[in-house]
Amino acid sequence: MPRLRGSGNSANLAGMSGDNFSDAVLVVLGHGTTLNAESARPVRQHCAALRQRKVFFCVSQACWKQEPHVRRVLAKLAAPRVFIVPMFISEGYFSSEIIPRELGFGEHPAREFPGTIWYYCQPVGSHDSMTGVILARAAAVVRQHPFPYAPKPADITLFVAGHGTGRNANSRKAIEHQVELIRAQNLYAGVHDIFMEESPRIADCYALAATKNIVVVPFFISDGLHAVEDIPVLLGEPERLVKERLAAGQPTWRNPTEKNGKRVWYSPAVGTEPLMADVILERVREAARKINNI
């Protein structure tokens, strides 16, 4: 594990002002993949937005599965405090076990070195403020595509679509929690979770919706394979047509599309919503407050 360079007495670093991050480096950590370089686009997007705010001394992007790799990014940093925020959709295997272990974190979410402290924050996707991100995505896709008219939320059934997997229940729990929070606001005629690999399935949205209008929001970080190809096909678009649109650089779902007697709007992934920058910042604030209170 590389040893960071820093300044000052590390014993006093944790006591700095919880909302003053002018001494700190933020590292936004994405999963990344060698199969799709665009998977890191949301990380770049939100890093750029946070740099403009000038809250941190420095904002760096990093990935686990592609360059710039998080270990190399951390090795080059020199700051009293380093906050690592996983740009992950849930508290799953990678964000909760693999990455903390490989970066040397034990049960405590902070590592102290001479002159610096690393903070490992909670993933963005499990934060309660993701409710606002989902609602922003749902409202925007209808507003941007009002044909033949923009229905009111009370005339829409909202679906939050996730992957779902029997290997880790947290993936499903994060979506179910958000559905409960949105449902409690009584904005939409109905709010449901649907999944690619668990029940209720993506295609079940047509039977579950009591309204003609449906909005589907994919609960994914990037507009990658699942969000751009798999879910449109599961919603009923021919696979050939989806691939042709993708190859031509066109949206793989036309908003709205009539399917099974319903009018369906399909939004971009939640991870590309600009409000995600606020979620990242809130995760940093929480980590700073938690350490200061220990």
Question: At which residue positions do the language-model features occur?
Answer:
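Active-site-proximal alpha-helix that buttresses catalytic centers in soluble enzyme cores
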Residues: 12-294
